[in-house]
């Protein structure tokens, strides 16, 4: 299974998306395949135990969870917003680490190597 990449920004000219693209190209030159998890295709609700208890794990969350679990690794482009991880990325990782029974389950991240990248602008 190819590597899965996530970028914590939806901005079209995101520096972090550019950084992840460079990483993906470098890995491709070494023979590693990767695929980007696009936010437009995820459609995840804001994490809530109320939603989880009443409606179960959203299909998009289960799909992301399965993709991460099956992947050979994870590439995360993580911008910093006011010193924190972006809510979009945190929400996706929160849903991806919940099991169908509504419990925390970090197993999708257990056996996969992960690379965290961040673009930093120095003024």
Predicted features, each with a name:
Residues 1-32:
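N-terminal beta1-alpha1 ligand-phosphate binding loop
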Residues 8-9, 39, 123:
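Cofactor-binding loop segments of dinucleotide-utilizing enzymes, especially the Rossmann-like FAD-
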Residues 18-21, 49-52, 89-93:
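Short, glycine/charged-enriched secondary-structure capping and boundary segments
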Residues 33-38:
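N-terminal glycine-rich anion-binding loops that anchor highly charged ligand groups
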Residues 39-57:
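N-terminal beta-loop-helix "entrance" segment that forms/cooperates
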Residues 56-123:
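Helix-loop-strand module that forms the ligand-binding subsite of alpha/beta enzymes
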């Amino acid at each position: 299974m190819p590597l899965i990449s996530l970028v914590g920004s939806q901005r079209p000219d995101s520096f972090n998306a550019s950084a992840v693209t460079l990483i993906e190209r470098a890995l491709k030159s070494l023979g590693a395949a990767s695929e980007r998890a696009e936010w437009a295709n995820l459609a995840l609700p804001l994490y809530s135990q109320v939603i989880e208890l009443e409606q179960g794990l959203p299909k998009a969350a289960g799909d992301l969870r399965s993709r991460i679990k099956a992947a050979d690794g994870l590439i995360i482009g993580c911008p910093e917003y006011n010193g924190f991880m972006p809510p979009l990325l945190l929400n996706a990782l929160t849903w991806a680490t919940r099991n169908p029974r509504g419990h925390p389950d970090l197993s999708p991240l257990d056996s996969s190597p992960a690379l965290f990248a961040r673009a930093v602008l120095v003024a």
